[in-house]
Amino acid sequence: MISEMEEIELYLSKLPVPKSNRYIRPKGGKVFKPPRVTNWEARAIWELREQFKGDAIDYEISVDITLILPNRRKRDIDNMLKSLWDVMEKAGVIKNDNLIFEVHTVKKIEKGKEGVIIKIRPFQSP
């Protein structure tokens, strides 16, 4: 089990696919995720499960996110984070994203590279 005092660092090799405006609603009303979304989710969940073997975190946490971007193209960071929280839940890293009490996000441009560094630690109230 992961100690509440321990900092956890995880890495994803691909940037999150932003959550909104990526779903297809045909006439039947059922929502489908495009392959780009489902492929990213499956890969991210697998990568997280390979790195995180403990029980899902069930206490208040602070999360530091470093988004490694391959270029200066505009990206929807808020929706990328929503996708990230979802896969962290599905992979069993966190019990629920409502346990995230503090978020610090940094964009880092590294030409030709991409990924996400996730650092999780217990939340300490100011």
From Swiss-Prot:
Similarity comment text for this entry: Belongs to the RusA family.
Domain of life of the organism encoding this protein: Bacteria
Role description: Endonuclease that resolves Holliday junction intermediates made during homologous genetic recombination and DNA repair. Exhibits sequence and structure-selective cleavage of four-way DNA junctions, where it introduces symmetrical nicks in two strands of the same polarity at the 5' side of CC dinucleotides.
Reaction catalysis annotation: Endonucleolytic cleavage at a junction such as a reciprocal single-stranded crossover between two homologous DNA duplexes (Holliday junction)
Cofactor binding note of this UniProt entry: Binds 1 Mg(2+) ion per subunit.
GO molecular function: crossover junction DNA endonuclease activity; magnesium ion binding
Cofactors that this protein relies on: Mg(2+)
Organism lineage string: Bacteria, Pseudomonadati, Aquificota, Aquificia, Aquificales
Source organism per UniProt: Aquifex aeolicus (strain VF5)
Any one biological process term the GO annotation gives: DNA recombination
EC number: 3.1.21.10
InterPro entries: Endonuclease_RusA (IPR016281), Endonuclease_RusA-like (IPR008822), RusA-like_sf (IPR036614)
Residues that bind Mg(2+): 76, 78, 97
Gene this chain is encoded by: rusA
The protein, known as: Crossover junction endodeoxyribonuclease RusA
Keywords from the named record: DNA damage, DNA recombination, DNA repair, Endonuclease, Hydrolase, Magnesium, Metal-binding, Nuclease
Subunit structure: Homodimer.
